[in-house]
Structure formats: C-alpha cells, structure tokens
C-alpha cells in the first residue's frame, strides 16, 4: 500500500515531508519521493529514490512551505527512479502522487500521445498529470479535475 503525505505550513516543507512519510514505512514500499515548490525558481524541486526515504540525501535548502511525498508499491511500470512518484506533467507545472490504479490508463495515454504528449515513465500516475494539463488548456482547474 502506498503512503501519501501533503504539507502546507510555516515550517520547512522538505524536512516535514521526509519525517512524516517515514511514519508510513511500516506499510512497505519499493520507492519513494518528495516534491516542493521552490519559490526561488518558481518550479518544483523533486527528489526520488529506490527504497526507503532515508536514501534521499543531499537535499537542497529550499525555503518552501508546501509539498507532497509518496511511498510506492509498483503496479504499473518497473521499480526505478523514473517511475517513482511524484510525477510531473509534460509542461512541469503539475506534480502529482496517487494511490490506486487507473484502469483505463492505456486508452487515456494513447489519447494524450495522439495529442502530442510524450511520457517519461511507465506509470498511470503520469497519465493523470498530463490529462489535467490537457484539460487546463480549455477549462479552469475545477472543471479540468472533474473531467
């Protein structure tokens, strides 16, 4: 079973995410990762690893107060850093983690490929981030998430 932790607060998000996701280690997992918004670059700072979250070393000092972390049991794709979560959308503006299986992810992935999307991972999660990006071209965030 996956573990997911989100953080919004006044303290350093990276350290909070890393310490809190460790509390879910008892569930077991094969890879892990975390992501925060780097206000200095206005982009995501992501670190991933195979195995425990403790294997993530040399975290950059990022003065961020928001982020997500994830521990993964592989259901789609091999166990590697590329398939570890968080997954980014093609334009790198959406970072997502998820627990579950998108049953029709292959159909959705094919639809997105036909619309010019390229994929880095073998995960169904990357399909979600790109599908949201696709719908944001036409709709607001609320409507895009509904679709």
Which role does the model predict for each range below?
Residues 1-147:
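Conserved short alpha-helical segments that host acidic/polar catalytic motifs at enzyme active sites
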């Amino acid at each position: 079973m996956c573990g997911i932790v989100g953080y919004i607060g006044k303290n350093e998000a990276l350290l909070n995410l890393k310490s809190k996701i460790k509390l879910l280690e008892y569930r077991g997992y094969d890879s892990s990762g975390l992501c925060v918004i780097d206000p200095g670059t206005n982009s995501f700072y992501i670190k991933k690893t195979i195995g425990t979250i403790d294997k993530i070393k040399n975290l950059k000092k990022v003065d961020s107060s928001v982020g997500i972390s994830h521990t993964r049991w592989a259901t789609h794709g091999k166990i590697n850093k590329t398939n570890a979560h968080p997954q980014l959308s093609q334009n790198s503006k959406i970072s997502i983690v998820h627990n579950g299986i998108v049953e029709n992810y292959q159909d959705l992935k094919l639809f997105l490929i036909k619309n010019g999307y390229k994929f880095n991972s073998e995960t169904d999660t990357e399909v979600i981030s790109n599908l949201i990006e696709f719908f944001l071209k036409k709709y607001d965030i609320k409507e895009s998430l509904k679709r």
